[in-house]
């Protein structure tokens, strides 16, 4: 890319942040990296909105099912109507939050165990088996 500023001409130099035009794979990976960084910056907000929308859709479908079921002639206990339709939609976002926290804890413990094992293998005392 060449730009004109006044009477002088400037051309950006080759560096690690400037993709070179010769290799298409490098440009593609550079662009994908930028898109991934943008997505990961906004991901918690998007996932929170999606969780709330799913819970609201579940609640509205539950209310519709309750209205249809109340107009029928069969007698059912109130628990049948309230169990999933109301509490399911209320607890769904909380359940997803708990799963995400458990994944973070599990990944932390897994990485910690690998680090301990690696440091033991690198720096630990190597004992050889001696015949009795």
From Swiss-Prot:
The keyword Transmembrane helix applies. It comes from Homo sapiens (Human). The lineage of its organism: Eukaryota, Metazoa, Chordata, Craniata, Vertebrata. Signal peptide: none annotated. Disulfide bonds: none annotated. It is a multi-pass membrane protein. It is found in: Membrane. InterPro entries: CD20-like. It holds the Pfam family CD20. Keywords: Membrane, Receptor, Transmembrane, Transmembrane helix. This is Putative membrane-spanning 4-domains subfamily A member 4E. Belongs to the MS4A family. The keyword Protein biosynthesis does not apply. The chain crosses the membrane at residues 52-72, 76-96. GO terms for cellular component: membrane.
